[in-house]
């Protein structure tokens, strides 16, 4: 996620059209990466609960099965993204002047998607064992590496050729490869030194079943959201290049707002999973409430700062007056949206950690498609409110789901959904 944002920011100094094209590509790639989340979400929940119950053998089995499955999935997805780039971007309605940027970027980044598949799996395993500091350190190192690579390859510095968008793609793919290697070294040295063969004879189909039982509905909610965003990006593309470019800038800006909510939710989910494994249900409930309050407060403060700085930020990124005007307005609308997003990020992670994986999926599918997509089309295209109208629909979607999830957490119906007996 961060690598794509860095690419967008640095390409803003290269071409607004390049930013728009890469924004569409990253939406497709993020959707593809959610396929890996089927396994990763199950890995995180199971490892957290097994560690809470002191069942180390089961932890090793879960991690081993997860790595194998995501390697296979990663190779398949890599092939689809690389060879299917022109077709997929044509289906997204990408204009000819943007296609040259989009295809080149997608073919390179997509070809190495399996790097991300394995990195996400190892990161989920480490975080569930209270070793989140290692993935965080790797992210910092890799982003610095990507910034240096982008600067060198986009603009032709340090004796490198000026490759533009393809340079950004090469830098991103290389950074993800380095990330994967470092994470595996940490996994073997700090967490699981080896995977004993006898742990996998016979193959632990029970753990595979549990991974899919948790992962399919959990990733299904994420995939529903991402697919709805792909369709909404198609709608925004119909509004023109300026709207599409503005959307790309805003999405990457506000990501820095909700990163804290993601970090709090992931850390809280690990602790909640451990508490559920230890049968400390009341403590898990109170921790979830605390995480939600902190996430909302920080997201609200950061989104207000972003809104107040909006004109300055957009003026730095582009000299297109319409993009600056439109983006500044949307950042103010986004302030209320981020409150609902913070609740959703906390609630979906917390409910999954307890084993209550179906409820977020059902709510997500119904509300995302009826409100975000339905109202997005109605407000943005049918009524002619444009990109601001679509952002109002996103605001309604996030906050309606947030209210529903808070009621679910307070009901305590998740308390009997754990997988460790």
Annotate the PLM regions:
Residues 1-7, 108, 142, 175-179, ...:
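Transmembrane helical elements of multi-pass membrane transporters/channels
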Residues 2-3, 32-36, 76, 80, ...:
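Residue-level hotspots within pore-lining transmembrane alpha-helices
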Residues 40, 109-128, 135-143, 168-183, ...:
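Short runs within selected transmembrane alpha-helices of multi-pass transporters and secretion channels
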Residues 47-114, 160-216, 272-337, 379-421:
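Short alpha-helical transmembrane segments in multi-pass integral membrane proteins
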């Amino acid at each position: 996620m961060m690598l794509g944002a860095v690419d967008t920011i640095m390409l803003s100094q290269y071409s607004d059209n390049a930013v728009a094209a890469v924004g569409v590509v990253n939406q497709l790639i993020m959707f593809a990466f959610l396929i890996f989340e089927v396994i990763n979400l199950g890995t995180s929940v199971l490892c957290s609960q097994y560690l809470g119950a002191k069942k180390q053998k089961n932890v090793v089995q879960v991690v081993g099965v997860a790595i194998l499955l995501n390697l296979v999935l990663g190779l398949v997805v890599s092939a689809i993204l690389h060879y299917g780039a022109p077709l997929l971007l044509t289906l997204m309605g990408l204009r000819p002047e943007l296609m040259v940027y989009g295809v080149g970027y997608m073919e390179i980044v997509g070809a190495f998607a399996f790097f991300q598949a394995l990195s996400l799996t190892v990161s989920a395993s480490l975080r569930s064992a209270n070793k989140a500091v290692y993935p965080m350190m790797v992210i910092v190192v890799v982003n610095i590496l990507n910034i240096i690579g982008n600067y060198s390859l986009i603009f032709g510095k340090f004796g490198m050729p000026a490759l533009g968008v393809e340079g950004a793609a090469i830098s991103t793919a290389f950074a993800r490869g380095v990330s994967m290697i470092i994470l595996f070294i940490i996994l073997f040295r700090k967490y699981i030194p080896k995977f004993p063969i006898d742990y996998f004879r016979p193959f632990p189909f029970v753990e595979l079943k549990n991974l899919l039982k948790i992962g399919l509905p959990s990733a299904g909610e994420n995939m529903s959201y991402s697919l709805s965003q792909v369709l909404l990006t198609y709608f925004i593309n119909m509004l023109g290049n300026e709207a599409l470019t503005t959307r790309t800038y805003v999405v990457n800006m506000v990501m820095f707002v909700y990163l804290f909510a993601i970090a709090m939710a992931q850390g809280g989910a690990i602790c909640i999973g451990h508490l559920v494994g230890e049968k400390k249900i009341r403590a898990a409930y109170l921790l979830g409430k605390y995480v939600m309050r902190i996430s909302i407060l920080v997201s609200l403060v950061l989104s207000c700062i972003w809104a107040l700085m909006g004109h300055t930020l957009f003026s730095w990124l582009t000299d297109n007056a319409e993009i600056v005007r439109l983006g500044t307005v949307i950042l103010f609308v986004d302030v209320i949206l981020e409150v609902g997003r913070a609740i959703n990020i906390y609630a979906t992670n917390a409910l999954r950690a307890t084993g209550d994986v179906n409820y977020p999926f059902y709510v997500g599918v119904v509300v995302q498609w009826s409100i975000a997509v339905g109202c997005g089309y109605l407000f943005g295209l049918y009524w002619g409110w444009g990109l601001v109208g679509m952002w109002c629909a996103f605001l309604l979607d996030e906050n309606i789901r947030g209210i529903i999830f808070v009621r679910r957490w307070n009901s305590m119906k998740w308390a009997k959904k754990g997988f460790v007996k």
